[in-house]
Amino acid sequence: MAGFIGKERHAIDEKGRLMIPARFRRKFESVTVEGVADAFSGLYIMKAPDRSLELYEPLIWAGMRKSLSGLSDFNPEERLLKTLMYESLEMVELDRQGRVALSREFLDHAGITKDVVIIGADTKMIIWDPQRLAALLQESADRFASLAGRYF
């Protein structure tokens, strides 16, 4: 199945809930992962270093978790990475209306007060405060060609 593709603008309600776009929710309808119930109910949300939020479906997070669990607790850098990743992570439930509740800690991290831009980035959804995203795109506009040339 195709990954998350596209961009949508949504608002956070007064209780800190975010509506997940219907086209992204459809991707969850048949998710089954070892250790996760057949009926999808949650996503994994992470505070990203660039001050955005990233939402992962259980199948993708399971792969990341497997990679993290392979790291050594006795290697200081690997242990630090595990600590930083898990400190930045929460599981959020999807309610019947297709919303997830975002904690104040996560909203503050991303500078989100009301509106958000949700970007489908194949294996994850990236959630941005619209002003922060606009600033990033403005600052990075001249780097796009060189980045694309380097990686494609």
From Swiss-Prot:
Keyword annotations for this protein, in alphabetical order, are: Cytoplasm, DNA-binding, Repeat, Transcription, Transcription regulation
Q: What SUPFAM superfamilies does this protein map onto?
A: AbrB/MazE/MraZ-like
Cited PANTHER family: TRANSCRIPTIONAL REGULATOR MRAZ
Q: Which domain of life is it from?
A: Bacteria
Q: Does the keyword Cell cycle apply?
A: no
Report whether Manganese shows up as a keyword of the record.
no
A molecular function annotated in GO for this UniProt entry is:
DNA-binding transcription factor activity
UniProt source species: Pelodictyon phaeoclathratiforme (strain DSM 5477 / BU-1)
Q: Which family does it belong to?
A: Belongs to the MraZ family.
In the record, biological process GO terms are:
negative regulation of DNA-templated transcription initiation
Q: Where is the SpoVT-AbrB domain?
A: 7-51, 89-132
Subunit comment: Forms oligomers.
Name of protein: Transcriptional regulator MraZ
